[in-house]
Amino acid sequence: MDSSNSTKETGDIPIPVTSSKSSKAAPPPVVAAKAKSTTKQPLVSGWKRGLGIIDFILRICAIAAALAAATAMGTTSQQLPFFTQFFQFKADYNDLPAFTFFVIANAMAGAYLVLSLPFSILCIVRPHILGARLMLLVFDTVAVPLVTAAASAAASIVYLAHNGNSDANWVAICRQFNDFCQRVSGAVVASFITALLFVVLVAVSAVALRQK
């Protein structure tokens, strides 16, 4: 009777010691994993934001180069001070289809770069956004062959203007049209710089999409 009364009064219930230790020892790895993930997240965001800033600066430089190339070529014209009754010696960019294509291609590239600036800023503000970054990657990749083709076609004409072709009896005209050749040569150089900047932009977007 005494033993049963003492058991009811105290209400002692045996608790297994091993289960309490295992339940208390489980949480620390979970806490450590959460701390590791939260530490990694700001680091990745910082890298992506830095790549976004580089992307924005490169686009500003590419805009300047593309518009400079299109403007220099589109305003190129030279007329020699001497002419005859039947002939007028004048060189104009639209006399050659390659130069016309050059102006159109670089103007399109410059317009696209201007329109892409808001999306580049969006990638800086929201570094983990994928849609805008993927869209920029696709259009930048399309712009690379467009600008490269225009610059290469114009470069071949500039080479003939400087050196001529004896097999085809094409004479070099840059001795007479010196100003014309200097302007178109500068435009071609600016266009190749634009193409190079587009290649770098594609690489930056690819790295930003790959970084996790």
Curated annotation (Swiss-Prot):
The keyword DNA-binding does not apply. Keywords: Cell membrane, Cell wall biogenesis/degradation, Membrane, Transmembrane, Transmembrane helix. Residues 71-100, 155-186 are extracellular. InterPro entries: CASP/CASPL (IPR006459), CASP_dom (IPR006702), CASPL (IPR044173). GO terms for biological process: cell wall organization. It comes from the Eukaryota. Residues 16-28 have a biased composition (Low complexity). It is found in: Cell membrane. Residues 1-28 are annotated as: Disordered. The chain crosses the membrane at residues 50-70, 101-121, 134-154, 187-207. One of its GO terms (cellular component) is plasma membrane. Signal peptide: none annotated. Residues 1-49, 122-133, 208-212 are cytoplasmic. It is a multi-pass membrane protein. Belongs to the Casparian strip membrane proteins (CASP) family. Regulates membrane-cell wall junctions and localized cell wall deposition. Required for establishment of the Casparian strip membrane domain (CSD) and the subsequent formation of Casparian strips, a cell wall modification of the root endodermis that determines an apoplastic barrier between the intraorganismal apoplasm and the extraorganismal apoplasm and prevents lateral diffusion. Homodimer and heterodimers. PANTHER family: CASP-LIKE PROTEIN, CASP-LIKE PROTEIN 1U1. This is Casparian strip membrane protein 1.
